[in-house]
Amino acid sequence: MSAQKPGLHPRNRHHSRYDLATLCQVNPELRQFLTLTPAGEQSVDFANPLAVKALNKALLAHFYAVANWDIPDGFLCPPVPGRADYIHHLADLLAEASGTIQANASILDIGVGANCIYPLIGVHEYGWRFTGSETSSQALSSAQAIISANPGLNRAIRLRRQKESGAIFNGIIHKNEQYDATLCNPPFHDSATAARAGSERKRRNLGLNKDDALNFGGQQQELWCEGGEVAFIKKMIEESKGFAKQVMWFTSLVSRGENLPPLYRALTDVGAVKVVKKEMAQGQKQSRFIAWTFMNDEQRRRFVNRQR
């Protein structure tokens, strides 16, 4: 009997331990990265970025029908189960307006990344349509390559370059566009030094030395920004007021619980009508996202009906 991972959303496909035999059939290159734990169980060498990339390729192909997926060296290689959890909890949030999970919901992914992970999962699981924004032209090229390499995704996912320095929604949400929700995995460090320190902590936790290969990649825009996560989300909150009638729910991951109080104050300042916190857990890792709206219950119901 496979042990369940505590805390994952009930609809998450990754409750059981990875079936490595099946995943190696899906992506044979994964086999070379298998290791044995001290307990004699087969596992993946998570300290090796090539191993994590091979695992992601297998997971996305097996569970989400993404046959062709790759990212350039140096970009974040996201853990698929945790990313899927955000999508499933977001689906529950959207269902509150109509009583059913929305098909064909329109979602804006702020910082879609080279990996395009949230749109890939959301399209397969719920048939949603995505717009992905990104500041990095290299990340956009990578995401577009994934979309173009997998039949059907071009109709479901479109990408936009954020050309305005420091802007989040401005320049991305066009006049008369409407979105059921936005999502975001914001940069969490406030400097390159802090980002390096975070990588060092992960390195030590895995018992690695400085010369060991790392699964802690990430470009500057993925890992840090001035003021860190709180400043980034506060900017998002500030801009969201200008799109109060075009977006039903604004959401963002928040990496640390202690970052919530200043965000709640910012949401009060802009007049958010409702604020929700969704707690998530993947194994030992605790995470959460906050969601806010400028629409009351009746306005959200009308918004959903108008979108269909």
Curated annotation (Swiss-Prot):
<dbReference type="InterPro" id="IPR029063">
    <property type="entry name" value="SAM-dependent_MTases_sf"/>
</dbReference>
<dbReference type="GO" id="GO:0070475">
    <property type="term" value="P:rRNA base methylation"/>
</dbReference>
<comment type="function">
    <text>Specifically methylates the adenine in position 1618 of 23S rRNA.</text>
</comment>
<keyword id="KW-0949">S-adenosyl-L-methionine</keyword>
<dbReference type="InterPro" id="IPR016909">
    <property type="entry name" value="rRNA_lsu_MeTfrase_F"/>
</dbReference>
<keyword id="KW-0808">Transferase</keyword>
<keyword id="KW-0489">Methyltransferase</keyword>
<protein>
    <recommendedName>
        <fullName>Ribosomal RNA large subunit methyltransferase F</fullName>
        <ecNumber>2.1.1.181</ecNumber>
    </recommendedName>
</protein>
<dbReference type="GO" id="GO:0005737">
    <property type="term" value="C:cytoplasm"/>
</dbReference>
<comment type="similarity">
    <text>Belongs to the methyltransferase superfamily. METTL16/RlmF family.</text>
</comment>
<dbReference type="GO" id="GO:0052907">
    <property type="term" value="F:23S rRNA (adenine(1618)-N(6))-methyltransferase activity"/>
</dbReference>
<dbReference type="InterPro" id="IPR010286">
    <property type="entry name" value="METTL16/RlmF"/>
</dbReference>
<keyword id="KW-0963">Cytoplasm</keyword>
<keyword id="KW-0698">rRNA processing</keyword>
<dbReference type="Pfam" id="PF05971">
    <property type="entry name" value="Methyltransf_10"/>
</dbReference>
